[in-house]
From Swiss-Prot:
Keyword rRNA processing belongs to the record: no
Family under the similarity heading: Belongs to the MurB family.
Organism: Beijerinckia indica subsp. indica (strain ATCC 9039 / DSM 1715 / NCIMB 8712)
GO molecular function, one term: FAD binding
Known EC number: 1.3.1.98
FAD-binding PCMH-type domain sequence ranges: 34-211
Protein name: UDP-N-acetylenolpyruvoylglucosamine reductase
PANTHER family: UDP-N-ACETYLENOLPYRUVOYLGLUCOSAMINE REDUCTASE
Primary location: cytoplasm
Localization, UniProt: Cytoplasm
Reaction(s) catalysed by this chain's protein: UDP-N-acetyl-alpha-D-muramate + NADP(+) = UDP-N-acetyl-3-O-(1-carboxyvinyl)-alpha-D-glucosamine + NADPH + H(+)
GO cellular component, one term: cytosol
Name of encoding gene: murB
Pathway of action: Cell wall biogenesis; peptidoglycan biosynthesis
Names of the cofactor(s): FAD
């Protein structure tokens, strides 16, 4: 258990409106359904309260923003400091002409659906990404031939002091699964599409959904794509070549359907999953000479002592 931060935070920010919770289990918040607790969770109701929170937070207290929990592994020792969760105002979508404004907590698939209803093309690829707009901006999320960089007009976010910043696509410095902007909590993005037949868009989204269901372990306890594709190669092919398809450690397994996915078959600890991923990396390096880079974000502390689940 962590020490209770709430009294300290309340003293430092008496006008805070957002909810504070202490020692919050995070396993239910993540798609892997495992991992330790958060020392403190702050639910930000809006940008103004988030800015106030950041502006009055002790700089020695660490922060981490948690969205849908789809591309993250929380280690078994939990996350020290404050985990920030977005409240309702960050879920808003506003459509004006060919542009769509979306809050950081908007699910990628919801933005894709809103664009389809408005007859705006360019967003269908988001149907294949299990995350939120904030996370998509952070890692230049992409799938099925599209990336967030392709549709971004501008975005904004807060720094650690609570100051608001605006960014153009050029200032974001996008590259493969990466943006160059650091130390910013993205709060909103403005995106642009083009007029397209809504039925055509829905048809494209349906094909993406079918392809995901056929080739990926959807509706399982997984964190999505585990490793980034190396230059000129596909991670899953290298993993398969190294003989890792179906490899297990405790209740953690390399998916037999798509071997760039790790799955929790029931009672896997976060350590089981991370250690299995490291085993895969070692085997791929030995077999192919390629060192795979984690795409899943691993955060938090390992436990003091750990026994592999049986």
């Amino acid at each position: 258990m962590f020490a209770d931060l709430i009294p300290r935070l309340r003293d430092a920010m008496p006008e805070l409106r957002g909810e504070l919770q202490t020692n919050v289990p995070l396993a239910p918040w993540t798609w892997f359904k495992t991992g330790g607790p958060a020392q403190c969770v702050y639910v930000a109701p809006d940008v103004e309260d988030l800015a106030y929170f950041l502006g009055n937070l002790d700089p020695d207290i660490s922060i981490f923003v948690l969205g849908l929990g789809s591309n993250i592994l929380v280690r078994d020792g939990g996350i020290e400091g404050v985990v920030i969760s977005f409240g309702p105002s960050f879920h808003k979508i506003v459509i004006e002409g060919d542009t769509i404004s979306a809050g950081a907590a908007v699910a990628d698939v919801k933005l894709a659906s809103a664009a389809a209803m408005a007859g705006l093309g360019g967003f269908a690829f988001l149907r294949g990404i299990p995350g939120t707009i904030g996370g998509a901006l952070r890692m230049n999320a992409g799938a099925f031939g599209g990336t967030i960089a392709d549709i971004l007009v501008s975005c904004e976010g807060l720094d650690r002091r609570g100051a608001l910043h605006h960014f153009t696509p050029e200032e974001m410095g996008f590259s493969y699964r990466h943006c160059a902007v650091e130390g910013i909590i993205f709060t909103q993005g403005l995106f642009a599409g083009w007029p397209e037949n809504p039925e055509k868009i829905r048809e494209d989204m349906g094909k993406i959904a079918q392809e995901r269901a056929k080739t990926q372990p959807v509706n399982t306890r997984t964190g999505g794509s585990t490793f980034k594709n190396p230059n000129g190669a596909k991670a899953w092919e290298l993993i398969d070549r190294a003989g890792c398809r179906g490899l297990t450690l405790g209740d953690a397994q390399v998916s037999e359907l798509h071997c760039n996915f790790l799955v929790n078959r029931g009672k896997a600890s976060a350590a089981d999953i991370e250690n299995l991923g490291e085993m895969v990396r070692q085997k791929v390096l030995a077999e192919t000479g390629v060192e795979l880079e984690w795409e899943i974000l691993r955060v938090g502390r390992p436990p003091v002592a750990h026994k592999t689940s049986r």
